[in-house]
Amino acid sequence: MSIIQTIDQQIAEALSSNTEYNDYRERWEYLFQSYMGGMEYKDGRYLTRYQLETDAEYRARIYSTPLDNHCASVVQVYNSFLFREQPEREFGTLDNSPAVLSFLRDADLDGRSLNSFMKDVATWSSVFGHCWIMVVKPNTGAVTLADEQVLGVRPYLNLMTPLAVTDWRWKRSVTGVYELVYFKYVEEFTPSGQTVKVWTPDTIQTIEVDQKNNRILTDLTEQNGLGYIPAVCAYNLRSSVRGIGVSDITDIADSQRMIYNINSEIEQSIRIDSHPSLVKTPETQAGIGAGSIIQMPDNLDPGLRPYILDYNGAELSAMLAVKQNLVEAIDKMANTGAIRATEARTLSGVAMQTEFQLLNARLSSKADGMELAEEQIFSMFANYMGTEWTGHVEYPGSFNIRDTENNMQTLKTAKETATDPGVYKVIDYEILELLGKEEPAKYLTNTDGLPGAYVPADTPGVPAGENCANCSYYNPFDQGCSKWDETVSPVYWCRAWEGRIEEEIENMREDT
């Protein structure tokens, strides 16, 4: 084999990709453009082309058609709930480590905090179905961890979409665990080519390819000290193919594309209605615009007089109805009908609650995936630091999704119907909770209706074991005190305290 053939083979191997990548690449590009919108989507040329339509006419129609980007809207809704509360992290052996503190502030050495980085992970895994995270540490030649700390060297993260990862291979170990044994991705695009990184459990190879001149500029191989490939596949939802996830917008993107084409038809319909086509002979001179003058030859046959071409296409209202049906279908697919609604919808309380529960289940599943990915990241981070990860990461597992306006209206109706003062107190408590306020018993310390000795039960001087919860005047149903006719806290105490016998306590427990 000649040297030229050898070089060509090396370049082809460096730029090659596996079967899964080749099969999914076109779909991934479509999902990426559907999420990004703007010029990315216009460059995809997703409008259906008319017969005999010229390139110039097609481009003009693309640039005049707006895109309703439902893909980005759905992903943003998911992230707004998923990261409403910050995850809780316990670092175990890495607690108070300067490297970890620096890592939390700047996870990718590009200014993004770990929380911001994980938001991007959630975004791209939602778009593509999965994304890849590399945990890497620069090789500066430092001998000890102390030397690395002096130089400020620590592990950092590199987020890659599936479009950048061109080849990967899994192998089942003797213990039955699947391990990543080959991982190749495009690290950087250069003016003349690209830089490719190839990881194996033993080596790290960096290849810089000059595609214009068909040559390899750099081929550097170094040892992989970890003994495994520090890559994390963050799934949105696992598919039947290892290393491939299920996107949240894979079906939404198709409906979005249909809406995009309907928008084009609506725009064309409005143009035709406003500016209908004029049929005339070549000799007839007609101006353009409202009130234009038409000059006909003197000897023109009356049967050849100019006339307006009638348009018998679909009605505008019919196209708008189809578009609205597609939007409702998108909301059903994403379980965001009550969240993204822009107008009041007639839904029963059960239907709305069911929709919220489905969205809550979807968000909980996404949170579990984020927990798993982040714990794998910290496990690799700890290996780089010469220790084992003993901490844990916890994302919110339940998302309190309620229709505040509908619940408030229900409570208002209940209060107008009720006659029992005790029920009034329960409704007032529910209203305060709905508004995000603390329950009255938690902040009520003294009112005109309570004695001055109304104090927390752990206050010095209060008899041990005495509190409002075990007082005979206390009603646990509405947290009311029949002695003072006030709402009280079960962990407070006053001088009017009177104990109740165990039978009374047990009966009240059974009643409540």
Residue ranges, per PLM feature:
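Extended, charged amphipathic alpha-helical segments
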Residues: 214-354
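A broad, structural surface signal
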Residues: 116-119, 127, 138, 257, ...
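Cysteine-centered metal-binding/redox modules
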Residues: 432-512
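Extended, helix-rich architectural segments
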Residues: 1-157
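Short, well-structured alpha-helical interface segments that form or flank functional binding sites
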Residues: 128, 254, 314, 318-321, ...
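Extended, regular secondary-structure scaffolds
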Residues: 122-239
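C-terminal helix-loop subdomains that flank or include functional centers
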Residues: 299-302, 317-318, 325-433
